[in-house]
Regions:
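Sec-dependent bacterial lipoprotein signal peptides
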Residues: 1-18
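Cross-family detector of peptidyl-prolyl cis-trans isomerase
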Residues: 18-167
């Protein structure tokens, strides 16, 4: 009896393995990746606009790169340029107001591995200047985040102070 069951089971499995697999048809139309990215950028812009409105950031202006800047304190002297070594202080927040960190750093503008948005914000600042900058995710840590405190695709707020410019 055991041999007969084994043969029947083996024969059944052999027949089933010969059948063509049924095709699974995805009924949802796939969105074009470019269109999906445009939708994400529009959603992120709404998040930034809501942050500006809820925090009453009067006077904050777009800078032409998709970032928003508000001068808090004017600096003095020459503006920082590409090639200058600058010392700056930054306090970084997610747009839910949770703090990411506060630090002081020295970078050579145009040659350092910092976020594109941070670089753009530092260029043109003067010694002693304080600036609030809202940076979209694509100019911050992008689709990966920083693998620590900044989640993927997160716009950031930077409160910057330029301490020193070395030419």
């Amino acid at each position: 009896m055991g041999l007969m069951r084994f043969l029947c089971l083996s024969f059944s499995l052999t027949l089933l393995s010969c059948a063509e697999p049924s095709e699974v048809v995805d009924e949802k139309p796939q969105m074009d990746p470019v269109e999906r990215h445009r939708m994400y950028l529009a959603q992120e812009r709404q998040i930034i606009d809501s942050y500006i409105a809820s925090h009453e950031l009067v006077g904050i202006e777009p800078n032409g790169y998709g970032m928003f800047e508000l001068s808090v304190t004017e600096g003095e002297g020459a503006m920082a340029e590409i090639g200058d070594q600058v010392i700056y202080e930054a306090t970084v927040y997610l747009l839910d107001d949770s703090g990411v960190g506060r630090y002081t750093d020295t970078v050579e503008l145009g040659y350092s591995q910092i976020e594109v948005g941070l670089h753009e914000a530092l260029v043109g600042m003067k010694k002693g200047e304080k600036k609030l900058v809202l940076i979209p995710s694509f100019f911050a840590h992008g689709i990966a985040g920083d693998m620590d405190k900044v989640p993927p695709q997160s716009p950031l707020r930077y409160d910057l102070r330029l301490i020193q410019i070395n030419r």
